[in-house]
Amino acid sequence: MEIHYHSRVVRRESRHAAGLVAPFVEPSASVLDVGCGDGYVAAELAARGASVMLTDIVDLRRIRELPFRLFDGRHLPFEDRQFDVVMLNFVLHHVPNELKAPLLDEAARVSRRRLFILEDTPRNALDRFLNRRHGCHFRAKIGSSAAFGFFTTAEWEWLFRGRGLVVKYARALGRFCRAPWQPFARSAFLLELPA
């Protein structure tokens, strides 16, 4: 699959995110990209051999070659244990706090083995300010007035463990890992379903 990016910045960001999840995706694994956005990260994984399905609450895809299903933000329209890996890349902070746990439960339900999550993880007041600005901007982009919430790394880990997920990997990412004008504190998490 040849991927045509609309900008070098998006190409860089997408390849970076795909590079973070790729070590946890075996060749020919089935992957669900929840909150897929433009679909570029999923396309990068598909180009590496993964079988990828995209889903989101709105259709913002630029990648049309991969299968896609809309979902209502609460219930993923897939069978139990359908995917090897379910990834939520910079998605959960856009989900209202009271719906974060149920969405994690849904992601775990449709996964056979693991979840991979990339999240903004504020560490100070400047991070919280920048995150709030980002959240408001994105809400305007998709025409939503729903609440959103950013958690620290410790808060995310507490939530994951509270859902019965095993945190196998938690890594702080560099502030400028995506772009110089997005100096957000971010983290990557690999979660496994209990045996």
Give each language-model segment a name:
Residues 176-195:
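Core SAM-dependent methyltransferase catalytic element
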Residues 41, 118-179:
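C-terminal alpha-helical "lid/dimerization" subdomain adjacent to the S-adenosyl-L-methionine
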Residues 93-95:
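A short His-aromatic
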Residues 10-27:
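Conserved alpha-helix/loop element of class I SAM-dependent methyltransferases that forms part
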Residues 38-75:
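Class I SAM-dependent methyltransferase SAM/SAH-binding core
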Residues 87:
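A conserved beta-strand element that flanks and buttresses the S-adenosyl-L-methionine
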